[in-house]
Amino acid sequence: MIAIGSDHAGVKQRQQIIDYLKEKGEQVCDLGCYSEDSVDYPMFAEAVCEKVQNGQADWGILVCGTGIGMSLAANKCHGIRAALVSDAYSAQMAKEHNNANIITLGGRTTGRELAWEMVKAFMGASFLHGIHEPRVEALTNA
């Protein structure tokens, strides 16, 4: 299960990602928001983080205007490792090296095709453990 949420600036891209994921046979938990009226992004970040924290979702996606606000909000939640990704390589590395459990993207800065490439890269990657494990453990225990 993939939890996904956005603020008003990420509504369109969130829906496009949901459609893409469902097309690929993925189960999606859509946590809003559902309109382009201005909302506060931290509440949507928290909703996605809770799903990941309690195991109801394997990982999550958050979308706001730039991805920065959602990344900051998500990383305040215990056990969450949210990575703002800008291309397929950063999405892959977020999983392989940092064991990210949430990726954040910018609805105003990322086109549809690039968003799909980033999601696909993250989904196809696995944590590499090894030298990365103590680093991730240090983040988790901070």
Predicted regions located by residue number:
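C-terminal binding/interaction regions
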Residues: 5, 9, 88-142
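Short hydrophobic/aromatic-enriched beta-strand-loop microsegments
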Residues: 27, 80-87
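Short Gly/Thr/Asp-enriched flexible loops that form oxyanion-binding sites at enzyme active sites
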Residues: 69-80, 89
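Short helix-loop-beta junction
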Residues: 20-27
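Short, structured active-site "lid" loops
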Residues: 44-62, 66
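N-terminal beta1-alpha1 ligand-phosphate binding loop
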Residues: 1-17
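A short beta-strand-loop structural module common to alpha/beta enzyme folds
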Residues: 27-38
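Short active-site oxyanion
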Residues: 1-2, 56-60, 79-81
